[in-house]
């Protein structure tokens, strides 16, 4: 199946797959991650799209924060520890997801992409 998506979504997916390639140890899972990463890389090449490394790295850094926050959140939830740290993980997750949205928006604008993600709420989260 082929679906047209915003370029920011493709950058996001590639960043997440690259994080998985660095962190997943299971060879069977890695096979699928590599396969998906290769498909997306070829798709960008076929479209003549070069990845803006600065925007990509910014998005990857945010996705790494989300990954780490989500891991802490899941660990706390598994232990049924719904304490202050659990709440902080939830707040950070919302904050980082909004930062991620803003970077994807900049990517879409940079590439003049007509498909653009929209949030249903008016204000972005501020965990400060």
What are these regions (language model features)?
Residues 1-128:
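Extended, charge-rich alpha-helical interface modules
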């Amino acid at each position: 199946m082929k679906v047209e998506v915003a370029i920011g979504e493709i950058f996001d997916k590639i960043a997440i797959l690259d994080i998985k390639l660095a962190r997943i140890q299971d060879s069977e899972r890695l096979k699928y991650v590599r396969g998906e990463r290769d498909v997306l890389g070829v798709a960008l090449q076929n479209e003549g799209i070069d990845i803006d490394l600065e925007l990509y790295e910014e998005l990857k850094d945010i996705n790494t924060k989300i990954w780490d926050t989500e891991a802490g959140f899941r660990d706390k939830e598994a232990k049924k520890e719904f304490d202050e740290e659990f709440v902080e993980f939830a707040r950070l997750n919302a904050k980082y997801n909004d930062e991620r949205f803003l970077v994807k928006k900049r990517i879409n604008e940079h590439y003049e992409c007509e498909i653009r993600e929209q949030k249903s709420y008016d204000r972005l989260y501020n965990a400060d």
